[in-house]
Amino acid sequence: MTPLYLASGSPRRRELLTQIGVPFIVISAPVDESPLPSESAPAYVERLARAKAAAGLVSVDGPAVVLGADTAVVLDGRILGKPENREDALAMLADLSGREHQVLTAVALDDGQRVHSFCVTSTVRFRAISTDEAQRYWASGEPSDKAGGYAIQGLGAVFVSGLSGSYSAVVGLPLCETADLLGQFGIACWQSLAHTPEVTNPQ
């Protein structure tokens, strides 16, 4: 089986691939993430996913399949990146407070012969966030390296009052669609089952 390389430094994506039992090797694939003029959010994330996969492919020897992915938080058509500082993070949380926004995650697979990619859009609804809550959340350190200034799988989960779409896509990798695409490249899931804590019935 052709080895799979993950062109991402995201620990969330590593955890998600491990969750579905797919063995992989992490590689670095830095790319210019600047949006192009008038580029739509779906086109932006899919272009970056493909660019990361292509950049990863040139750094490995022999047959390989490289997975690249990119996630963007979008509010009113505006892409919210990682906050630059405390003020930026608090402004993002204020904008997201009490509203719905979209999270777009694109995934690309590249084996040097073909490149396939897709984009999944999910809608996340936030409850109202007080100024004090936003300040305490920033102090936790979690928002500083997260697109949109929050992590749905972390402390930021308390802000989420609803979600339509793929939870795993919001975290960083839509597992259902990714598993299907991996299968098209001959890479099966459930090769190495992740450890699942035993659940004991308290009754």
From Swiss-Prot:
Main subcellular location of this protein, as a coarse class: cytoplasm
Q: Where in the cell is it found?
A: Cytoplasm
Catalytic reaction(s) noted = dTTP + H2O = dTMP + diphosphate + H(+); UTP + H2O = UMP + diphosphate + H(+)
Which Pfam families does this entry report, sorted A to Z? Maf
Annotated Gene Ontology MF terms? dTTP diphosphatase activity; UTP diphosphatase activity
Q: Name one GO cellular component term.
A: cytoplasm
Q: Which cofactor does it need?
A: a divalent metal cation
Instruction: Give residue numbers for the site Important for substrate specificity.
Output: 12, 71, 153
For this protein, the record's InterPro entries field holds: ITPase-like_fam (IPR029001), Maf-like (IPR003697)
The UniProt keyword set, sorted, is: Cytoplasm, Hydrolase, Nucleotide metabolism
Q: Which GO terms describe its biological process?
A: nucleotide metabolic process
* SUPFAM superfamilies, per the entry: ITPase-like (SSF52972)
In terms of superkingdom, the source organism counts as Bacteria
EC annotation from Swiss-Prot or TrEMBL: 3.6.1.9
Please list the residues that make up the active site: 70 (proton acceptor)
> CDD domains, from UniProt?
Maf
Give the enzyme class.
Answer: hydrolase
Query: Does this entry carry the keyword Cytoplasm?
Result: yes
Q: Which Gene3D superfamilies match?
A: 3.90.950.10
The protein's role, per its UniProt record: Nucleoside triphosphate pyrophosphatase that hydrolyzes dTTP and UTP. May have a dual role in cell division arrest and in preventing the incorporation of modified nucleotides into cellular nucleic acids.
Which family does the entry's similarity section mention?
Answer: Belongs to the Maf family. YhdE subfamily.
Q: What is this protein called?
A: dTTP/UTP pyrophosphatase
Q: Which organism is it from?
A: Pseudomonas putida (strain ATCC 47054 / DSM 6125 / CFBP 8728 / NCIMB 11950 / KT2440)
